[in-house]
Amino acid sequence: MTTKIKVKTSESDWHKRWKLYYLRHHGAQLEVQIGSHVCDVLLPNGQIMEIQRKPLTRHQIEARELEYQDRLNWVYDSQFFLNRIVDQRNEKFSNEDFHFLPLDYRFKFIGKTNSIVFHREPVWIEHKMSFYRLITWQFNGRYYGKFKERIDTY
C-alpha cells in the first residue's frame, strides 16, 4: 500500500521523507494550523516537529517558540547547516544568540543526509538563555549534555 502525503510542492524530498516517517511510524498529523503558524508535524503526544533545511532568522525562531512553547522540536539538515550551526561547547552562552550543537546521525530512510533533532531546554528558557539540546533518543555515539555554562561531550 502506498501512503500519499500532502506537502507543499516546493518542499524537497528530504522534507517529504521526514514527514512520511512521522506519519507512518508515529501517527502524526501534517501541516496543522496552530495559532498563526502551520506546523510541519504534530505528534499524538502534542509535540511539534519543525523540519528545517535552511537557516531561520532569530525572529522566525522566536515566533515559533512563542506559539508552540515547550512542545517545539527542530529537525535540521546538518548537510546544509554545517557552517551555520554554532558549536559553543567551551564558551559562555549569550542571550543574544541561538546555539545549536551538531551531531552526526544517519537515518536509514533519509539516505546519505545526516539530520539532527533539537528541543528547547526548559530550564534555559527560565534563565532567558537561547540554547537547544539534542534529543537523546536519536543517539549515534556522541551526546552533548548541558551543565551550567559549559557543555560536556560524552
Where are these regions (language model features)?
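Acidic-basic catalytic patches of nuclease active cores, encompassing PD-(D/E)XK
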Residues: M1-Q33, L43
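Short linear motifs at secondary-structure transitions and domain/linker junctions
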Residues: K16-L20, H25, G46-Q52, D97-L103
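Structured beta->alpha junctions
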Residues: Q33-I34, R53
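Beta-rich catalytic cores
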Residues: H37
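Conserved catalytic cores of phosphodiester-cleaving nucleases, focusing on short active-site segments
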Residues: V41-T57, Y68
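Hydrophobic beta-strand segments of well-ordered beta-sheets in folded domains
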Residues: G46-I48, D70-V75, V123
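Mg2+/Mn2+-dependent nuclease catalytic core
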Residues: P55-L82, V86-R89
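Non-catalytic C-terminal interaction segments of nucleic acid-processing enzymes
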Residues: S78-Y154
